[in-house]
Amino acid sequence: MPTINQLVRSPRKSRALLNKAPALQHNPQKRAVCVKVYTTTPRKPNSALRKVARVKIAGYGSEVIAYIPGEGHNLQEHSVVLIRGGRVKDLPGVRYHIIRGALDSRGVQNRKKARSKYGVKKS
């Protein structure tokens, strides 16, 4: 515990906030190119084959892993996608989501509810 005199000499420093999606460089979304599209398994209590893509962000070329939400997708290597921040809790290292229905990523087929999240037009 510092004395009042020590606090007068040098006040307390507030901790810097940690950026949860540093690859976006404070942008809401970024364009990226798929390098590899594959499936991976989630952490311990869950079991599935989650679809993810390793993407290279346009402009400065850092590579991150992005989750492909929804059932079925048309992404392959060299697909141009739009990524946003947002982690997937049961996939370690996945801190970005691919936005469905933007650029090369098609919206989810036969989606009736929560359409805006999966890039589906009103039918």
Swiss-Prot record:
The keyword rRNA-binding belongs to this UniProt entry's keyword annotation: yes
Disulfide pairings: none
Modified residues (3-methylthioaspartic acid): 90
GO cellular component terms given for this protein: small ribosomal subunit
GO molecular function: rRNA binding; structural constituent of ribosome; tRNA binding
Keywords: Methylation, Ribonucleoprotein, Ribosomal protein, RNA-binding, rRNA-binding, tRNA-binding
Coiled coil stretches, renumbered: none
Pfam families with a match to the protein in the record: Ribosom_S12_S23 (PF00164)
SUPFAM superfamilies: Nucleic acid-binding proteins
GO biological process, one term: translation
Role this protein plays: With S4 and S5 plays an important role in translational accuracy. Interacts with and stabilizes bases of the 16S rRNA that are involved in tRNA selection in the A site and with the mRNA backbone. Located at the interface of the 30S and 50S subunits, it traverses the body of the 30S subunit contacting proteins on the other side and probably holding the rRNA structure together. The combined cluster of proteins S8, S12 and S17 appears to hold together the shoulder and platform of the 30S subunit.
Quaternary data: Part of the 30S ribosomal subunit. Contacts proteins S8 and S17. May interact with IF1 in the 30S initiation complex.
Family: Belongs to the universal ribosomal protein uS12 family.
Identification of the protein by name: Small ribosomal subunit protein uS12
Organism: Ehrlichia ruminantium (strain Gardel)
Gene assigned in the entry: rpsL
